[in-house]
């Protein structure tokens, strides 16, 4: 991380499932609290895998958060004394999150966002590419391929132990029971056209 000379910027943490995005978001938020900064943490209400009132990493690290149904709800929970705004699972929000995150940074807040950069199909996921484009800092994390142990940048969705079809719904909230990290060579999407 580099030193910012002005207040207000946007950091994005992205990567596949099991790459440590939530864990890294929690680490950055904890550092801010150690520095006596006032922090507000948010996540979408759809993310209820481990807790409805906390951001929880797959390894069990957690931090209390506000579960919100729309990006505009963030404004209801921050004040002028807030220094840092963190949002996990940003891929589940609509386009409004891009404007809210940008506006927060413009107003002087340090904004930390985390989310999947690709969906299970291996395609850009929702608003994350737009957030990536406007962020001052982008950290792309990789997991470990569950097949070969190579660095994994893809999320493999499994239905009854088999790769999900390209035509399956993009959003299916789940964890290890439904997903694995895979490298480019072991990521399978039946029905996806080969270019």
From Swiss-Prot:
Subunit description: Homotetramer.
Looking at the keywords, is Hydrolase present? no
Task: List the InterPro entries.
Answer: P-loop_NTPase (IPR027417), Thymidine_kinase (IPR001267), Thymidine_kinase_CS (IPR020633)
Q: Name one GO biological process term.
A: thymidine metabolic process
Catalytic residues per the record? 89 (proton acceptor)
- Which positions does UniProt annotate for Zn(2+) binding? 145, 148, 183, 186
The UniProt GO MF terms for this protein read: ATP binding; thymidine kinase activity; zinc ion binding
Is Membrane included in the keywords of this UniProt record?
no
**Keyword field:** ATP-binding, Cytoplasm, DNA synthesis, Kinase, Metal-binding, Nucleotide-binding, Transferase, Zinc
> Where do the annotations place ATP binding?
15-22, 88-91
* Intracellular or extracellular location(s): Cytoplasm
Q: Reaction(s) catalyzed by this protein?
A: thymidine + ATP = dTMP + ADP + H(+)
Q: What is its main location?
A: cytoplasm
A Gene Ontology cellular-component term: cytosol
Output the lineage of the source organism.
Answer: Bacteria, Bacillati, Bacillota, Bacilli, Bacillales
Extent of the signal sequence: none
The identity of this protein, by name, is Thymidine kinase
């Amino acid at each position: 991380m580099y030193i910012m000379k002005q207040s207000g910027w946007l950091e994005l943490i992205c990567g596949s499932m099991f790459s440590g995005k939530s864990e890294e978001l929690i680490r950055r938020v904890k550092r801010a609290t150690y520095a006596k900064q006032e922090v507000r943490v948010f996540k979408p209400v759809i993310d209820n895998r481990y807790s409805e009132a906390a951001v929880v990493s797959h390894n069990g690290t957690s931090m209390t958060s506000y579960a919100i149904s729309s990006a505009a709800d963030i404004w209801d929970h921050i004040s002028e004394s807030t220094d840092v705004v963190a949002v996990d699972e940003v891929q589940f929000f609509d386009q409004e999150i891009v404007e809210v995150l940008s506006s927060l940074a413009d107003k002087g807040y340090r904004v930390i966002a985390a989310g999947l950069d690709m969906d299970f199909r291996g395609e850009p996921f929702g608003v994350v590419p737009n957030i990536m484009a406007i962020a001052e800092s982008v950290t792309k994390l990789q997991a470990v391929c569950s097949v070969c142990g190579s660095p994994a940048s893809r999320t493999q969705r499994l239905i009854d132990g088999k790769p999900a079809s390209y035509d399956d719904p993009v959003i299916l909230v789940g964890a290890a029971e439904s997903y694995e990290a895979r490298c480019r060579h072991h990521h399978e999407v039946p029905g996806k056209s080969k270019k």
